[in-house]
């Protein structure tokens, strides 16, 4: 890779015989050796992984490969974030070719493809894959960087999942939000800072249908009713709830703002 020997020797000595301990509420554990995996609190680990990943992708020829998906006149065949890598192609043959190239180049630098953590997502029919005698699992959806990706591209499962996660956060904060020691404006700010971002995560790419609009509006109203301790059985208009809480921009409005910002950034790209 062209890295001087003195630097590789320094890194090797840094990781050789590395030990760690875990501190808990009951004290610290015994020291144990770290054989492989992520080196906790090591600022070098992400840099080293990115260096290897870039080296593998370049040697695999992914930059010059014709396989991939055309987006805004650009050919994209791989997405990488930290240690998550996604390969994309328009056909099964192209995808398998990309995967085998990456696998071969990875083995040259001592990295092995973990079939147990590898998934295939296809929008159509696909044959069963076997690599080194192991079958690669084919799925209809999976979680990538915190968002659920489905084979049919439907955003409804992800929006429902996000609303469910938002409700869990509200439940966890229930004692704080209902505390009489916290003013209503502070509680509203807590919801906007800790609950709504959970729901809005990844919403820039959502296609929101009428049913989702109703669910989103219902979730937001449920949050404000909870702050005011107003049950659903109470005859209280939505307008009066919003007037008392004064949340400002609605949840749907915040989502629209994120969508426009996302669109604007891509529109300005050359």
Predicted segments, located by residue:
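Nucleotidyl polymerases of mobile genetic elements and RNA viruses
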Residues: 1-257, 261, 269-270
């Amino acid at each position: 890779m062209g890295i001087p020997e003195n630097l590789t020797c320094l890194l090797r000595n840094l990781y050789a015989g590395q030990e760690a301990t875990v501190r808990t509420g009951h004290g610290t554990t015994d020291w144990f050796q770290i054989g492989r995996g992520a080196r906790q609190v090591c600022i070098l680990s992400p840099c080293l992984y990115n260096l290897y990943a870039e080296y593998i992708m370049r040697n695999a020829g992914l930059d010059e490969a014709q396989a991939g998906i055309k987006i805004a006149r650009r050919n994209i065949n791989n997405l990488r974030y930290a240690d998550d890598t996604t390969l994309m192609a328009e056909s099964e043959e192209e995808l398998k070719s990309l995967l085998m190239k990456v696998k071969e180049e990875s083995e040259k630098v001592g990295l092995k493809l973990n079939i147990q953590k590898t998934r295939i997502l296809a929008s159509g029919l696909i044959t069963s894959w076997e690599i080194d005698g192991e079958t690669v699992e084919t799925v209809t959806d999976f979680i990538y960087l915190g968002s659920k990706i489905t084979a049919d591209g439907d955003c409804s499962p992800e929006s429902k999942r996000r609303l469910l996660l938002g409700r869990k956060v509200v439940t966890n904060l229930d004692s704080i939000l209902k505390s009489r020691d916290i003013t209503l404006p502070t509680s509203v700010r807590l919801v906007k800072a800790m609950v709504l971002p959970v729901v809005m995560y990844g919403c820039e790419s959502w296609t929101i249908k009428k049913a989702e609009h109703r669910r989103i509006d219902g979730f937001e109203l449920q949050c404000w009713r909870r702050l005011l301790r107003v049950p659903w059985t109470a005859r209280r208009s939505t307008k009066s709830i919003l007037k008392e809480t004064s949340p400002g921009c609605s949840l749907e409005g915040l989502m629209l703002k994120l969508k426009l910002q996302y669109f604007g950034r891509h529109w300005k790209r050359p």
